[in-house]
Each structure stands twice: as C-alpha cells, then as structure tokens.
Amino acid sequence: MDFAVKRLRLASAVEGIFLIAMCAGAQPAARTRNPDDTVRINQIQVIGSHNSYHAGLLPGIAKLLQQKRPDVFASLDYAHPDLATQLNHGVRQLELDIFADSRGGLYAHPLGTKLVAQAGLPADPVPYPEDVMLKPGFKVMHVQDIDYASVCQPFVACLETVRAWSNAHPQHVPIFILVETKGIRDGGLPDTEHPWTVPEPWTPSVFDALDAEIRSVFSPDKMITPDQVRGRNHTLDQAVRKHGWPTLKKARGKVIFLMDQAWAGPIYMEGHPALRGRVLFTNATPGHPDGAFVEENDGNAKVITALVRRGYLVRAQADSDTVEARTGDVRRRDRVLSSGAQIVSTDYPPFEPARWSGYVVALPDGLTAQCNPVNAPSTCVNSWLEPALSH
C-alpha cells in the first residue's frame, strides 16, 4: 500500500477517535488530528550512515595497508552500497566528505596507484572515468591518494542521486546530508616518503562555490535552510530554543545540509552572520549565533540529552573505526539511541550487519524513523513518520 494512502487512513482513524471523544464530552486538543502539524524535525530519531559514499579500499591499497599499517587498514575495512540503496533501506542521514577542486584535476592521479606499483602488487581498477576527476568541482572521497573510491563522483552527482530518490518518495521525513570539508588539517599519508596531494584550502569564496553547487541541484522548496529556521529571530540559537525547528508538515520531501567540521564554521560565516544567506547549518557551539546543530560523536548520553532538551539538533556516532563491530559491543550504541540524539550515525545500518559479529544499528520494529525518546510530543506516532521496513 502506498505510504500516502496509509497516512490518510491513519489520519481518518485519528479523526474518528477525536469525534468519539467529543461525543463523550471530552475536550481533546485539535492538534491530535494530524501529527505532522505538531511534531518537529528535532523530535524524531533516524539512523544515518557514516561516510555514506565509502566504497571500500581498492584491493592493492588494502593489501599495502595490511602490510604497512594494519591498524589503519582495520579502521577503514568497511564499505557501503550506492546512496539510493541506502535510502531504500531506511538510512535518513547521509555523509559526504568533499575536497575542493576549483580548477579540476587535483585528484585525478592518486599517489596510491604508484605505491601499489612500487610494491609489486596488481594495479587497482580505476573507480571512475578520468574525465570526471579532471573537471572543476568538489570531489567526494575519504582520504586523497589512498582511500578515494566512492559510490558517487563528483559531489554534484551524489546530490543528484539523492534528489532523484527524494522526488520519487515525496513523503519521506527530511534527509540530513552531513558534509565534511576535508583539507590540509586532515594530516598526511602514513609511512611514505612520497609527497601526497595537498588539498585546496577552504576560504569564504570556496564555500560560496559549495553553496552554489548545492543550489544547482536542490531548489529552495526542497531544502530547509538556516534562514528558514531563523525566521524573524536575530540568531539561530534563539530560534531553535524559543520557537523550535520546522514541523514535519513543512519538512517532508526535503533535505537539510549540515557541516561536520567545527573549524570550518567561522570561515563559512564570514560575511554571513548567524548563517544569513547560507545553505548549511554549522557544527556550532551552543549559545553562539549559529547554534542549532551540534555533533557529540563521543556518545556522552548526559550531554546529548541536555542539548536535545534545549532544542538543538544532535548527531552522534554509535560506533567508530570498526571497533564495536568486531566485538559486538553494543553499549555505546544503546547509550546513543537512548540519549535522544536525533541522528545516530553508524558504519552498520540495518541492512549492513558487521561480518565479524552481526553488530548493527537499527530502530525497533524495522522503523525508518521513530518518535524521539527524549522530547517527542504525545501526538507523535511512529507509524505516521514513515512505513516500517519490510525486511
């Protein structure tokens, strides 16, 4: 049955309960008629994939790292399918790591191919046509030169995949797109005397280009932006704490862009106080003018719950570096899920259990989204948010 039809039937059922209550002389609030009118996007909880683009290490690079840096290999030993498949299986937060490449070609010839050849290993397959990497525009990868295979390339192509899926499923809860701006701060290639590709620095003008690429794919009516959330308030922090985030009624079928790197926020805000005119929500310090979205990836449940109660949108990681997945340790996962973090990120979403232990991060009963365990209103109904996954 189509989800829109299911929601219509549920709405009719809620209407029926409302009328029965009226006949019985009760005075229920009119807001019970439609949860979309009352439930806000920070009052739900969804599962996200960490490094959603990550196609896994190429065979030669993997062998090389196993020999030289087994610890690094272990932390990178995971992969995801294409973005549409992830969305089909209930992932509602995607993470895309991007490198600026304003002239094109900066990442067209990765050092890893030379290192593999020098080690006498078979050449790795080319993950995408060279002309894609020669054109100007933001590129998607984990680490330049060694971990560069992605399920989509370039950044615009990844966004187009999300847009196509969203257009085909217009009733979805908002899709959160976390953007990690990779740069020189991310360090160098371990254990090599060879120079690796120096990333292009992030400047206000580079961020202008990033906003332009996003806007070239998503029209204003398909995004939730800082300006929309701020409204007439002076700051975003004031808006989310006093007035709240948009309701599901205003957010279905849309995307929200979030910035991963806290250091990039001040650069992104130059000339854009409180993110005026910008597309992404920064990973901000609570109480600051851009305060709306916060990352608490260490999984401190008390801190997360306090932030959620204050009105902030929080992303937290249930696992990292394949550590929990190798042992099946679910303690961090369970803390994060119960903390109220609206976005729970993992390398192992419901359809991708860890091959070592079966470790997985999923909402109960196959849910794609659930009412937030900390701040959801009484009007929130899990089955109203999105249909449960059939598998």
Map each language-model feature to its residues.
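Extended rod-forming repeat segments used as scaffolds/tethers
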Residues: 9, 22-23, 104
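Positively charged, low-complexity intrinsically disordered regions
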Residues: 8-10, 28
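N-terminal secretory signal peptides that target proteins for export/translocation
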Residues: 1-8
